[in-house]
């Protein structure tokens, strides 16, 4: 099915589009297998932030331009002393900020993977809530081969997903795994033919759109809290506070303060 994706905002190294309440963030550097630079990452952070705040958007897709690669990680050509160097000549690892944003954004984020998801690209796949993989997808880590590693979500959370033994294999041996192998280890949710991957991804997104956004928000926060320690608890607590602010009980406390009177909390139920 051909869809008319609407461009929401123009960027240099990514695309940011909208279709039927679904945002799509596309890394647009196919000439380098969608490897990212600090500028690519900053643009993705901006797009994801806008998607978080946009009331039209229920679900977000992350993908790469073309059929050959989802993302091949950081562009080694701009890797300098202490990080990846952008236009400002400051070495950065701002992809860590993007990883955290994908984790805490209160909307489902779905990785749509075609071709290579390697290195930092595989880590982006890992931190997404769900993954729809094309049958040509290839996953793996390369860090120890190129003098790098991800000791955060890319290893610790990966181990939660595929098990510690498998995660160590992935990192220690730096092998590549096809789509079926990724499915078997729980790294992706489903595998479909390449020409059907967008249809399947959009179908999953449309199914989630039919469900309670508050329920999905809290489920995401709860699962994150299990793995993210106090940072995860902070996310869930913040979501709970926002929900509480919408209740008559919370409004009674606010209004009583503004009206300089004692609040009447006795009127509200005390559920067991």
From Swiss-Prot:
Cofactor(s) for this UniProt protein? hydrogencarbonate
What UniProt keywords apply to this chain's record, in alphabetical order?
A: Lyase, Menaquinone biosynthesis
* Metabolic or biological pathway: Quinol/quinone metabolism; 1,4-dihydroxy-2-naphthoate biosynthesis; 1,4-dihydroxy-2-naphthoate from chorismate: step 6/7; Quinol/quinone metabolism; menaquinone biosynthesis
Provide the residue positions that the database annotates as binding substrate. 33, 72-76, 84, 116-120, 142, 148, 245, 260
Task: Give the GO biological process terms.
Answer: menaquinone biosynthetic process
Q: Where along the sequence does the record put site: Important for catalysis?
A: 84, 245
Catalytic function, reaction form = 2-succinylbenzoyl-CoA + H(+) = 1,4-dihydroxy-2-naphthoyl-CoA + H2O
Gene3D superfamilies in the cross-refs? 2-enoyl-CoA Hydratase, Chain A, domain 1 (3.90.226.10), Lyase 2-enoyl-coa Hydratase, Chain A, domain 2 (1.10.12.10)
Please list where the region (Disordered) is annotated: 253-272
As for what it does, the entry says: Converts o-succinylbenzoyl-CoA (OSB-CoA) to 1,4-dihydroxy-2-naphthoyl-CoA (DHNA-CoA).
* NCBIfam families per the UniProt record, alphabetical: menB, PRK07396.1
The protein, known as: 1,4-dihydroxy-2-naphthoyl-CoA synthase
Query: What is the source species?
Result: Staphylococcus saprophyticus subsp. saprophyticus (strain ATCC 15305 / DSM 20229 / NCIMB 8711 / NCTC 7292 / S-41)
Gene behind this protein: menB
């Amino acid at each position: 099915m051909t869809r008319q994706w609407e461009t929401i905002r123009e960027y240099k190294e990514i695309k940011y589009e909208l279709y039927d309440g679904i945002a799509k963030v596309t890394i647009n550097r196919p000439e380098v297998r969608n490897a990212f630079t600090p500028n690519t990452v900053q643009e993705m952070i901006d797009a994801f932030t806008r998607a978080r705040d946009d009331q039209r958007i229920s679900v977000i897709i992350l993908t790469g331009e073309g059929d050959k690669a989802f993302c091949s990680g950081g562009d080694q050509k701009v890797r300098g002393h202490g990080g990846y160097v952008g236009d400002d000549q400051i070495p950065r690892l701002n992809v860590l900020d993007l990883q955290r944003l994908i984790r805490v954004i209160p909307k489902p984020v779905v990785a749509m993977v075609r071709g290579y998801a390697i290195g930092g690209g595989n880590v982006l796949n890992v931190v997404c809530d769900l993954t729809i993989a094309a049958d040509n997808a290839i996953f793996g880590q390369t860090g120890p081969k190129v003098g790098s590693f991800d000791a955060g979500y890319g290893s610790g959370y990966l181990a939660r997903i595929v098990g510690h033994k498998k995660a160590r294999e992935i990192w220690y041996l730096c092998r590549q795994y096809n789509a079926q192998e990724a499915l078997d280890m729980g790294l992706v949710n489903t595998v479909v033919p390449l020409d059907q991957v967008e249809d399947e991804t959009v179908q999953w997104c449309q199914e989630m759109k039919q469900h309670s956004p508050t329920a999905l928000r809290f489920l995401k926060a709860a699962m994150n809290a299990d793995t993210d320690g106090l940072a995860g608890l902070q996310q869930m607590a913040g979501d709970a506070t926002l929900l509480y602010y919408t209740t008559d009980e919370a409004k009674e406390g606010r209004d009583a303060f503004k009206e300089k009177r004692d609040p009447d909390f006795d009127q509200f139920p005390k559920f067991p």
